[in-house]
């Protein structure tokens, strides 16, 4: 039986048991006292803590650190790199002060006195700040480690500082010479400061101190502003007429030397925005505008047009200050109307653009006449002509199969077209798209390598992103180790002439592979060559491949390398040699001389949209590099860069050009975007020289609008040039001390073939005409080694050829004497003249052989070699 309590139990709480409640109070007090005692014991009694260690080098013992020392980095708020930067910048600023203090005694030009005054005042103030910053942090005002003299000099040079020799030369100069040296050195000095800032900010944890970061930001802005001012001053010292040309869309100032502008054709309707023909970007909305913007397309477009200063976009409204014009959008519009490259065939000129193609009829002495326009957006619109077929490169992701204007926004679409378009132009007034070749990276440029009645072989160069495999089978991007990648290749395309709709890629060779290991990425891997070099693009594409089929050779300008190929088998190009250059950012295009013994490569530093011809831009960056081809190897000879300074509102860098076919010489006409057109003589590949130019002022006075000349080519006696924004220009060369009337006339007689395509060179020949002989003679006359009476002898011989009374024997003896003299001369033009005189005799002999009434015969002794 269970025992039970006769009375129910109640909870034991203080309310019912006062004694228990008191007990709890006593217990709590005792426990609190014990806790206090324990805490005091822990505080007052040393305990063994876990050690904090800083390891030494391998094999060396670790160092034990106190907690306050271990946390010192985060507590300090600055890094060793910050300290080094400030210490170096003090030295850097002091040299700027030293240079500025030279100004007042060496020039009285107020603009220079103002620059020097600003520099001296600002640099002294900044030195004071930097010294205070270091002192407050218990840091030395100078670097504690003193490198060797040679290392220190190199370190200072990398900071943009002038050498001791340069400072001495500056101190000993006066007037304009001083002004030029001062600005050149000071701009480089300021550029060095910007480089130091950029280097520091790349480092993790640097400039964490808000005061230091604000100082660096202000310093960077101030140095860049001063560079812009000095750039204008330095350009003003130039005696080149191209420096300082007034801006304008249709009314820009012009400068020409040994060239004449014959015609300037604006873009036809449908190939420009009538409300904004200059392509000036819209103004950005001001942050102070509180009203909610109307985001409708109509409102946005209307606002854009209202913000333009004029229909041409020549003027600017709303400038905040002299140095800070109103900001404009940096985004690209859906459609671009930029003119690009050209191709010629007979009397047909095809002008490509991002928007399509314009076909013109050209006749000697006449203004080109528009035949028809093909609207087919897709960029960049490079063109070639083969018979009745017109090829067009398309690269943009918004390009459409149907040439539609609406673009494509879907990530994957069957309507997207990127590759090579093929048009039938047998009816020039009604071109028809008859074929397409889709490619993984689109088509930036293309080269017609070979063609006959059956097929056309084309090399395709894609430089854009690799499209997704879901859109085009076989397109693999940058996946490590995957040899199926579309990178590091060119495409070989076959176009059946009678059925261009069956055009296809027949191979995509890996032309950059390591010839020993077979690794696809076998050439330049990208990056800088050394601490002072240009940053060169990775070689995973070719921008241009210029083919010279008759010589079985091609030159590839392939992003990070210049390459020559053997194309004896057009389907399997074989790399012969590859070079790189510390001054090249992006190997862009290539042109052979007529003999195929030289190649001129261009560097498109800045991508064509940046100002790269300012007074302080290096003369071997964004330039041409000229190579001789010796035993199938590229041998560097020289650089050439546009000598005229351009402004920061002018995109300028080396771009497309072609040979001017003057017999006996290597002459090149070239587009430099807003730098204009330059004609150079590189007959002496070690010493290229400019012999002519044409240039306009910038499109806009305060904003960089991408424009200028895309391409300039010689064709049938005239130079045709596509102006990105303004349209098509036609120019001629004029006689000068560099180029005679006979040489220009001989070039006009040159046989370039029936077709001229941008990346396809044909051997040029000249007829056996007296004017060609006189062109050679003019070249020899310029040489100091030419016999004084040679010109008299040649002219006498040419006169004898036209005189029916002269016997064949007289002509034979005269020829023998002349050719003996010419053959003994070590001069290219002498060899050319000797051969031409023989041709003239042979040509006359052939003519006379068909005339039974002519009694003159030529002895066998003068038979041609």
Role assignments for model-derived ranges:
Residues 749-865:
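Soluble extracellular-acting proteins and domains
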Residues 33-46:
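Bacterial N-terminal signal peptides
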Residues 1-29:
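N-terminal secretory signal peptides that target proteins for export/translocation
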Residues 239-782, 796:
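Feature marking well-ordered beta-strand scaffolds used for ligand recognition
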Residues 86, 93, 100, 116, ...:
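Generic L/I/V-rich hydrophobic alpha-helical segments across diverse proteins
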Residues 185-188, 192, 199-202, 232, ...:
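Short basic/hydrophobic patches in alpha-helices and adjacent helix-turn junctions
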Residues 80, 84-87, 177, 184, ...:
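Short, solvent-exposed segments of well-ordered alpha helices
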Residues 50-238:
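All-alpha RGS (Regulator of G-protein Signaling) helical domain and cognate RGS-like helical scaffolds
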């Amino acid at each position: 039986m269970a025992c039970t309590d006769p009375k129910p139990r109640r909870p034991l709480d203080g309310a019912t048991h006062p004694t228990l409640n008191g007990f709890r109070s006593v217990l709590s007090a005792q426990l609190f006292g014990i806790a206090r005692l324990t805490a005091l014991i822990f505080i007052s009694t040393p305990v063994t803590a876990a050690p904090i260690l800083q390891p030494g080098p391998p094999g060396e013992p670790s160092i034990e650190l106190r907690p306050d020392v271990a946390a010192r980095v985060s507590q300090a708020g600055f890094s060793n790199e910050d300290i080094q930067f400030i210490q170096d910048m003090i030295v850097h600023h002091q040299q700027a002060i030293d240079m500025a203090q030279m100004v007042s005694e060496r020039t009285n030009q107020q603009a220079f006195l103002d620059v020097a005054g600003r520099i001296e005042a600002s640099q002294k103030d900044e030195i004071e700040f930097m010294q205070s910053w270091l002192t407050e942090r218990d840091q030395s005002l100078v670097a504690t480690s003193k490198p060797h003299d040679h290392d220190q000099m190199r370190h200072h040079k990398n900071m943009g500082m002038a050498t001791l020799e340069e400072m001495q030369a500056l101190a000993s100069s006066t007037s304009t010479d001083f002004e030029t040296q001062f600005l050149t050195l000071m701009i480089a000095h300021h550029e060095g400061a910007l480089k130091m800032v950029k280097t520091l900010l790349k480092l993790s944890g640097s400039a964490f101190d808000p005061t230091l970061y604000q100082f660096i930001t202000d310093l960077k802005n101030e140095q860049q502003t001063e560079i812009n001012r000095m750039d204008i001053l330095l350009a003003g010292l130039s005696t080149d007429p191209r420096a300082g040309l007034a801006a304008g869309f249709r009314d820009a100032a012009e400068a020409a030397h040994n060239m004449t502008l014959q015609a300037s054709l604006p873009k036809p309707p449908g190939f420009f925005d009538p409300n904004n023909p200059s392509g000036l970007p819209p103004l950005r909305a001001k942050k102070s505008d509180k009203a909610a913007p109307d985001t409708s397309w109509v409102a946005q477009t209307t606002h854009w047009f209202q913000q333009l200063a004029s229909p041409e976009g020549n003027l600017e409204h709303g400038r905040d200050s002299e140095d800070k014009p109103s900001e404009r959008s940096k985004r690209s519009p859906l459609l671009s109307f930029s003119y690009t490259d050209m191709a010629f065939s007979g009397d047909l000129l095809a002008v490509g653009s991002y928007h399509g193609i314009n076909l013109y009829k050209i006749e000697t002495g006449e203004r080109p006449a528009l035949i028809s326009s093909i609207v087919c957006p897709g960029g960049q619109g490079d063109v070639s002509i083969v018979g009745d077929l017109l090829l067009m490169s398309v690269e943009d992701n918004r390009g459409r199969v149907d040439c539609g204007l609406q673009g494509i926004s879907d990530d994957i679409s069957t309507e997207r077209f990127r590759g090579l378009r093929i048009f039938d132009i047998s009816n020039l007034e009604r071109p028809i798209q008859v074929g397409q070749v889709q490619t993984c990276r689109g088509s930036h440029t293309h080269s017609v390598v070979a063609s006959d009645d059956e097929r056309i072989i084309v090399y395709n160069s894609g430089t854009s992103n690799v499209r997704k495999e879901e859109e085009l089978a076989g397109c693999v991007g940058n996946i490590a180790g995957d040899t199926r990648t579309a990178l590091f290749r060119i495409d070989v395309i076959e176009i059946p002439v009678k059925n261009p709709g069956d055009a296809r890629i027949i191979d995509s060779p890996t032309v950059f592979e390591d010839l020993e290991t077979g690794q696809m990425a076998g050439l330049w891997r990208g990056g800088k060559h050394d601490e002072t070099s240009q940053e060169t693009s990775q070689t995973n594409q070719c921008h241009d491949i210029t083919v010279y089929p008759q010589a079985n050779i091609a030159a590839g300008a392939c992003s990070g390398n210049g390459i020559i190929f053997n194309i004896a088998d057009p389907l399997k190009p074989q790399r012969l040699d590859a070079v790189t250059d510390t001054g090249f950012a992006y190997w862009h295009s290539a042109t052979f001389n007529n003999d195929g013994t030289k190649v001129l490569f261009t560097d498109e530093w800045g991508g064509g949209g940046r100002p790269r011809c300012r007074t302080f831009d290096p003369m071997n960056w964004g330039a041409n590099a000229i190579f001789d081809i010796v035993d199938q190897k590229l041998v560097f000879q020289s650089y050439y860069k546009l000598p005229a300074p351009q402004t920061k509102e002018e995109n300028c860098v080396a771009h497309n050009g072609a040979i001017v076919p003057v017999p006996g010489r290597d002459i090149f006409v070239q587009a430099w975007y807003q730098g204009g057109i330059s004609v150079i003589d590189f007959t002496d590949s070690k010493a290229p020289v400019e012999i002519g130019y044409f240039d306009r002022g910038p499109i806009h006075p305060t904003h960089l609008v991408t424009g200028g000349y895309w391409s300039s080519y010689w064709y049938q006696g005239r130079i045709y040039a596509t102006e990105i924004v303004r349209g098509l220009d036609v120019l001629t060369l004029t006689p000068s001390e560099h180029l005679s009337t006979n040489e220009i006339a001989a070039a006009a007689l040159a046989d370039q073939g029936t077709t001229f395509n941008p990346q396809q060179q044909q051997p040029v020949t000249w007829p056996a005409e007296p004017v060609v002989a006189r062109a050679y003679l003019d070249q020899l006359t310029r040489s100091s080694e030419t016999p004084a009476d040679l010109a008299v002898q040649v002219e006498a011989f040419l006169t004898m050829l036209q005189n029916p009374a002269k016997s064949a024997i007289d002509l034979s003896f005269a020829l023998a004497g002349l050719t003996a003299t010419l053959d003994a001369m070590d001069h290219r033009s002498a060899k050319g003249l000797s051969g031409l005189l023989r041709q003239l005799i042979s040509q006359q002999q052939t003519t006379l052989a068909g005339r039974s009434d002519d009694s003159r015969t030529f002895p066998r002794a003068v038979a041609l070699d």
